[in-house]
Every structure is written in C-alpha cells, then in structure tokens.
Amino acid sequence: GSANMVSFIAKQHGRNHTFYTQYAFRKEYASFDSYVKNHNFANLDYVYSTLSNHDGENPVDYAAFEANPTGFTVVACNAEDGSTKYFGKSDVGYDNFDILKASSAVPVACEPYAIDGVPYYDGGIADPIPVQKAIDDGYDRIVVILTRPKDTVREQKRDIGPARILRRTHPQAAEKLLNRYQTYNDEVALAKEYEQDGR
C-alpha cells in the first residue's frame, strides 16, 4: 500500500504495474533462494533502493513526490513491543525509502526492518485499516480500499501458524498478529459506521 501511494503522489501512474507484472518475477525481487540466504523472501532493499533510487531501473520521481501537497502516512509495527508506529511524508528522503521497507516487512517471510535501531514489521499487523488514525488526523472524507468484499469477516486461523513462529523471536509482535483478525473486523465495522454518516 505505501509503495503504491508513493508512485501515486509522484504521479507515476503505471509504475506499480511494472513492479507487479515484470519485476516481481525476478529472483532478486522475491525468491526462496533469497529467503534461504538472508531470511527475506522479498528483498526489500532491491525493491525500494536498487530499483527505486534516482539511479535505479525505475526511480521514484522524488521531486514530484515532495512537491505534491498530498498527505502521506505509513504504518509499521514495532517488532519489539508490538506498538503501532506512524511515519509521515517527512520520513521519506531522496533515495531513502526505509519506511516503505519497514511497512512491507511481512513477518516470517521477512526479517523486521530497522529504522534508527528499531525493528519494524508490516503495519498491517498493528493497524490494518487505519480509519481511526485518519479521523484523528482531521480527515473528514475517507476512502477505504479492501481486497475482499466489505462484509467478509476475517478469521484468526490464517494467522495462528505464523504467530507461533514469530513468537520465538518477537512475542509482542506475534500477539498483534494473533489478534489482527479482530482489529481488522473492528476497523471495517468502524468504516461502515462512518459510511452511514456520509464520511
């Protein structure tokens, strides 16, 4: 999600499509070999530095991203204590997309990504649909894009196995993952309430 928004804000329409349809099949991008070598199925440095930096194959137009007044918030989960971390647009820099790496580090498939010495996992664990965060930040109209029908109730069973594995190294993040289903369902319910209110 966060990487898609960077391209959108930079007005590089079609950029993400290239990542999903061309680069994603490269073994440097994501592969079992990468997982065996460095415990990361997805090579976040390859995706968000090698390809995306100014001298990369498909660079982010950082000047356009920075000039666009559109707000930008990225969610990550602190791997050590399970807390939610919100990063802002000012946390992105020229050839510095570390917050995208942190927010894309899927537990078990990837090691947590450290920023300023703090390891982070994908924000979908801690705040999968940050509707309340958007309201708290003062937005009165919110668009929620779901990958499943809005009446689908998320179940815990898909997260039990990964949470058991994660508990060995990051028990607090594992607890967040184990309860993600409830957080997701609560936030969808909240979004529906706001929808009924015309927000």
Each model region followed by its residue ranges:
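Patatin-like phospholipase
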Residues: 1-54, 88-102, 143-146, 150-159
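A generic, well-ordered mixed alpha/beta core segment in the N-terminal half of proteins
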Residues: 53-56, 122
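A short alpha-helix-loop-beta-strand transition element characteristic
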Residues: 55-70
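Glycine-rich, charged/polar anion/phosphate-binding loops
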Residues: 58-59, 127-131, 188
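Active-site gating loop/helix substructures
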Residues: 66-167
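A short acidic, glycine-rich active-site loop
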Residues: 168-186
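C-terminal helical/tail subdomains of lipid-metabolizing enzymes
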Residues: 188-199
